[in-house]
A protein has these predicted regions:
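Acidic/His/Gly-enriched intrinsically disordered linker/tail segments
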Residues: 4-113, 117-163
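Beta-strand-rich domains and repeat architectures in extracellular enzymes and scaffolds
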Residues: 162-179
């Protein structure tokens, strides 16, 4: 909620003149879905003893994507449309927290707020433009760097799991993930 209500530049001027007009005075609600939800899950994890960022299930989804080299695209996790394959809309949360954690780890946690602040001041640049201005990388570069980092991390995790011994599961339905 905090990052969505940031305002600067023209949005702040409009707010002072007309009050809260959601899209005009809260431009961060237009941030990519993965960044909005990734930031929320990142802080949910960082500021509590729980948090989905520590979830072994999230790790499993990302490990599977990394080891099979079958990632969702950045477009798919940036919007809120219904995705027909598992894990559906949860992909924005799962990928988002991993991407946000990567950004904080590589560029520093202050970069997260810098991106939110910069987007609130210049939303017409789009997230890609703000990313380039703030971090000096394109969205495509960030996406590729994150995938390489994740593959390396998950390969190591996968090898450790294999050493412990795999457990075979049993498929109980063919109806898909909406059962």
């Amino acid at each position: 909620i905090f990052q969505m209500d940031m305002k600067g530049g023209q949005a702040e001027s409009i707010y002072r003149a007309f009050g809260k007009v959601p899209v005009l005075t809260s431009p961060n609600m237009l941030l990519p879905f993965w960044f909005l939800e990734g930031l929320a899950v990142y802080y949910e994890t960082r500021l509590t003893q729980a948090g989905r960022g520590r979830s072994s299930i999230y790790d499993m989804y990302l490990r599977t994507a990394a080891l099979q080299d079958e990632f969702y695209t950045i477009d798919e996790i940036s919007s809120q449309y219904l995705m027909e394959s598992w894990p559906g809309l949860q992909a924005a949360y799962i990928y988002g927290v991993s991407l946000v954690t990567y950004i904080a780890g590589i560029y520093g946690e202050e970069a997260l707020w810098g991106l939110s602040r910069a987007f609130s001041e210049t939303p017409l640049l789009g997230f890609g433009g703000v990313l380039e201005d703030c971090l000096g990388v394109t969205l495509g570069q960030l996406w590729g760097d994150w995938q390489a980092w994740l593959k390396e991390k998950m390969l190591s995790q996968g090898e450790a799991i294999v050493r412990q011994g795999l457990v075979d599961g049993e498929q109980i339905t063919r109806r898909g993930f909406r059962v």
